[in-house]
């Protein structure tokens, strides 16, 4: 839009030891692209609880991965349910906030203007659609996404953000209101190992015992806990909380 204030929370996608000030986005140019497209659309609304879930998409890669991945899963499941080519439907998501709360909208619409009404026709069998979507997301053994579950040549441009496990977390929240459980201690150890050598260069030693992980510097020692990116960041004295998504996909944010 024309409001420059929307850029104030957009940070540099990298860290520099020479530049300490925030980016002012003074050279940005507003460009609006769009066209009228009349078609049928199905929208699924997921209400989020900001007390439990980090609802800020600019800093939470989980929210973007979960929304995009669940949208792709719903499209593939809908095409199987309707026995049509997946090119007949287009999918996407948006995160919105208003006085009523925070929401993720997953939408499906026909790829052709004034199409055959596929997107709306699936509304009558929404329960079967969600069940089939769950089967698709749970029926794979990959770590995030592959060509056996969510990836195909039409969505190559978003392959890097597809994550069937994040999609399952969002689907579980929508159906039961349950958050993903805490990261098991063994997995926390595994994820933190990727930072061990980097931290040693800065003079920080990672101490792992049977119950917890500690980061020890020259002047202080703090407990380190890896938490699910879906969660609102916990707060606890003398404890550093690190998102598991940052350790997997964006280590520079974890440091």
Residue ranges and their predicted role:
Residues 1-198:
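Extended, highly charged accessory segments
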Residues 47, 111, 226-232, 242-246:
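Structural motif
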Residues 101, 219-221, 253:
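Elongated scaffolding segments in large macromolecular assemblies
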Residues 237-255:
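Basic, glycine-rich
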């Amino acid at each position: 839009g024309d409001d420059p204030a929307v850029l104030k929370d957009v940070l540099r996608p990298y860290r520099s030891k020479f530049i300490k000030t925030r980016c002012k986005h003074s050279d940005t140019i507003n460009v609006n692209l769009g066209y009228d497209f009349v078609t049928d659309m199905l929208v699924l609304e997921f209400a989020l609880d900001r007390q439990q879930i980090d609802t800020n998409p600019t800093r939470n890669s989980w929210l973007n991965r979960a929304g995009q991945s669940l949208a792709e899963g719903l499209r593939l499941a809908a095409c199987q349910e309707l026995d049509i080519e997946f090119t007949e439907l287009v999918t996407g998501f948006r995160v919105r906030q208003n006085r009523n709360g925070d929401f993720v909208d997953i939408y499906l619409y026909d790829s052709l203007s004034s199409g055959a009404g596929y997107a709306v026709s699936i509304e009558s069998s929404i329960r079967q659609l969600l069940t089939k979507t769950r089967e698709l997301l749970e029926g794979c053994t990959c770590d995030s996404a592959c060509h056996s579950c969510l990836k195909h040549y039409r969505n190559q441009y978003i392959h890097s953000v597809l994550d069937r496990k994040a999609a399952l977390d969002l689907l579980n929240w929508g159906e039961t209101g349950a958050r993903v459980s805490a990261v098991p201690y063994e997995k926390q150890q595994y994820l933190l190992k990727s930072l061990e050598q980097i931290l040693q260069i800065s003079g920080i030693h990672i101490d792992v015992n049977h119950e917890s992980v500690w980061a020890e510097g020259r002047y202080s020692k703090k407990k380190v806990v890896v938490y699910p990116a879906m969660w609102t960041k916990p707060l606890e004295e003398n404890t550093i909380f690190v998102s598991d998504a940052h350790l997997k996909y964006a280590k520079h944010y974890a440091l």
